[in-house]
Structures are given as C-alpha cells and as structure tokens.
Design a protein with these regions (language model features):
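Active-site bordering "gate/hinge" segments
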Residues: 110, 146-177, 185-429
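Terminal low-complexity/charged segments
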Residues: 1-190, 267, 352-360, 367, ...
Length: 429
C-alpha cells in the first residue's frame, strides 16, 4: 500500500485539511501519530483514506511553539474520531490541540508527570514513583485557543450540569470484556453522553519498543490483543519484510493466511458467545466456547500456544505446520459449518434475541466513517471497509470470498455479520 505524502505548515493546516476532507473526499481518518521529530520539534502524522477509491495519504505537520506549549489546530470539526486520537497524542506527546473541547489525558492518570513518548522523557524510577493513592477526580475539562495577540488561552469547562444523572460503569465491569471505565449521563434508559476512561491495562509497549531490535519487538505484538495475536504480529512482520525487500514463498503466505483465518474464527466465536452470555443465553455461550476449543487445539498443535502463539517470524515462520495440521483443519471446517447454523437456531433467530438487539446501538454509515467504527461493526452499517479486500495482502486476492455488509446499522446486524464472516473464513481456509 503506497501513500501520498503531504507536509503542511501550521498556518495553512486547518484550511488544507478541510479541503482534503470536503474536496478530495478523504472522509476516513485512520489514525493520528504523535511524534517527537528531534530538532524539528513535536508534530503529527495523519493517515487519511478516501472510502470510495480506497486511496490513502499521509499528512505531516509540525506543532507551533506558543508560550512554551506545542500546539496544532484540532480536526475534530472534520472527523469525530479525532476526539480520542488527539487526546491520546496530548497524553503521550504533550501536543495541545487548539479548539478541542476536552483536552484531558486519556490513558494515563491525571496526575502523571510528563509525556512518555517524548525523547527527553525521564525514565528513571525516581522520576516515575508508583502512585499509592486514588486518582484525583474532577468534573472539569480544558479547551485551548489563541487570543487575538497570539497567546495561548486556557478555558475550563464543567463536564456535568447540576441536574445530570451520572452513572459510573467500571472500571471493573461485570462482563470484563475489556477493562475500562465509562462515566455516563443518562435520562431514563437513554444514554445522553459518555466519557471514557481508558488505559487500565496500558503497558507502554510503544515506549518499550524504542529500546528493542525488530526481532525483540515481536513477542509483544501477540499481547496487544490475544484474540487477534496472529494478525497483530502479521502486520508488524509484514511492514518489516516490505522495508527490507524480503520475498516470501507462497507456502509461507498460504500458512499465514490460514492461521489468520483460524484466529478470526476464534475471535468471532468469543464475540458470539459473549453476546449470548450478556443476554442471559448461557447455552449459546457454551456452544461457542466448546467449538472455540477445537480451533485453539488445532493452532496449539503447530504453534505450541493457545492465545499467545509467537508463530510468525521476520521472513518466515517459527516452524513448519504440524504433520496432522492439514487433516485437522479439514475436519474442523467440516464440523463448524453445521454448528454455525446451530448458533442461529438456539440464539440468533430467537425472538427474544431480536427484541433485545434490533434497533439497539444504531449507527448509520456516515457516523461509522466519521467515528472510524471499522471491522464487523462498520460493515453492519454498509461500510465496505475490510482490509483484506480494500488493501489485500498474502493470499487474500488469490482466493474467492465475499465481503459481508448489511444495512441494519444495529446490534442485530452486527451479530449477523459475525455469523456470515465465519462462513467466509471457512471458505478462505
């Protein structure tokens, strides 16, 4: 995948970004990368995508020094996902985004000192005392702007009104699908606003990588998300191999593709099972967990691991596949097809399931793109965003399979997308 690289100055950054969004139709903000460029100063790289043509571009800009602070105009008015992305950059790099309505830390504690992804960050234990007290709480946020004479203005705002009914969810949610805390403002059963608190299991992997060789970094990719360990490592070894000009054999590419799809089945089965569990359907949950065990057993025979496999290497694999791998995968695929229909019979097509999922969590196509809701959730709103189709790698452009999209834009169709993608993964394998 090639990018068109653009560099913008501080003065024309806001207007040129608006042109990229409104005239060039780069409507999807993939990510914002905060960076310490050394003598150049602090800055950001924005990755943008045109969802109609799949064209991508990168935009680099250097922050301006104002009253000792590094500032860049916000793009939250163009892409709503910038709300969290800019807060992440502020948290780790320290760039303040002018006009952002909620410039608080996102991952680290509010009383954390410094910004750890800066090159001059002091890593010594003396400067990073482990806190033994509760994190300070406040209801205020900060917005930064420039005054008429060019000085930085800090404005404090309250997040909650006096009559807001605030309910805290987490940080230890009963379902523990991900450790986070949500401050919600509710009106009856309607959620009016949500303020997320992330980072409870943030381990500073980016900072650790700064002092590692490329082979040493691989062990940490599997731990980014144990439900997609293969894919995370695949992404890293893929860019390293491309940069080094390493050509892989078709055998390695086939094995990686099959392993990725086995991992996808593993992940989707857990999603389907936990959805059933959250609605009280324990039978459907146990069915999914039972079949997920079969998938993990097949991967474990070759990789030696069930969740953390450490299988892909730069330029190849840790080892060849197990002698029984091919036969076991064929047996697994034959077994799973009728089981998927069983999930629908027991849970997915149940009237109670439809009553609880239809119309819940509505998010239309425009909102999905604006908030960068990708994956099966975005495809359930009609967004054709599957990287395997849009930017194919390994053997995904060599096999026939369908990209599943639905238009219900609710939790029910998100469930159905996962179901249909199980069939597609079996077809790819």
């Amino acid at each position: 995948m090639k990018l068109n690289n653009i560099e913008l100055s501080f003065d024309n950054f806001a207007s040129e970004m608006a042109k990229l969004k409104n005239e060039k139709h780069f409507d999807y903000l993939v990510t914002i990368i905060g960076e310490d460029f050394g003598e150049e100063g602090l800055g950001c790289i924005y990755i943008l995508e045109n969802t109609q043509t799949n064209e991508r571009c990168s935009v680099k800009t250097i922050a301006k020094k104002v009253d000792g602070s590094d500032v860049i105009p916000t793009v939250i008015n163009l892409w709503k996902v910038a709300d969290l992305l800019e807060r992440e950059v502020f948290d780790f790099v320290g760039i303040k985004f002018l006009g952002h309505p909620d410039m608080r830390r996102l991952f680290l504690r509010t009383d954390f000192q410094g910004h750890p992804l800066r090159k001059d960050f002091d890593m010594s234990p003396e400067a990073n005392q482990f806190p033994c007290t509760d994190e300070p709480e406040d209801d205020f946020t900060v917005e930064y702007s420039l005054s008429a004479d060019g000085h930085l203005v800090e404005t404090q705002k309250r997040r909650f009104d006096d009559d807001d009914y605030v309910v805290n969810i987490g940080p230890n949610h009963p379902s523990t699908h991900g450790v986070l805390r949500l401050q919600t403002v509710i009106d009856g059963e309607t959620v009016k606003r949500i303020y997320p608190h992330l980072g409870y299991i943030h381990r500073g992997i980016e900072k650790m990588w700064e002092g590692m060789t490329y082979p040493q970094t691989l062990a940490l990719t599997d731990r980014l998300n144990y439900l997609s360990a293969m894919m995370h490592r695949h992404a890293l070894v893929g860019v390293i191999e491309e940069a080094m000009g390493i050509e892989l054999s078709d055998r390695i590419r086939y094995i990686r593709t099959i392993m990725d799809e086995l991992q996808r089945i593993d992940s989707h089965l857990l999603y389907l099972g936990c959805t059933a569990q959250d609605l009280g359907a324990l039978t459907a949950f146990l069915y999914c967990m039972r079949d997920r065990e079969h998938v993990l057993n097949v991967m474990e025979e070759t990789t030696g691991g069930r969740l953390i496999q450490n299988y892909y290497r730069i330029g190849g694999l840790q080892a060849d596949i197990d002698p029984n791998f091919v036969q076991n995968v064929k047996t697994l695929c034959k077994y799973l097809r009728p089981m998927i229909q069983e999930y629908l019979d027991v849970f997915g097509d149940n009237v109670i399931t439809h009553n609880r999922l239809e119309g819940v969590g509505p998010m239309n196509l425009e909102d999905c793109i604006n908030y960068a809701v990708t994956g099966p959730a975005g495809r359930a709103s009609g967004w054709k965003n599957d990287t395997r189709k849009r930017h194919p790698y390994d053997m995904y452009d060599k096999v026939e399979w369908k990209e599943i999209t639905l238009t219900g834009c609710d939790s029910m169709d998100r469930y159905y997308v996962h179901i249909q993608e199980l069939y597609q993964s079996l077809d790819i394998i």
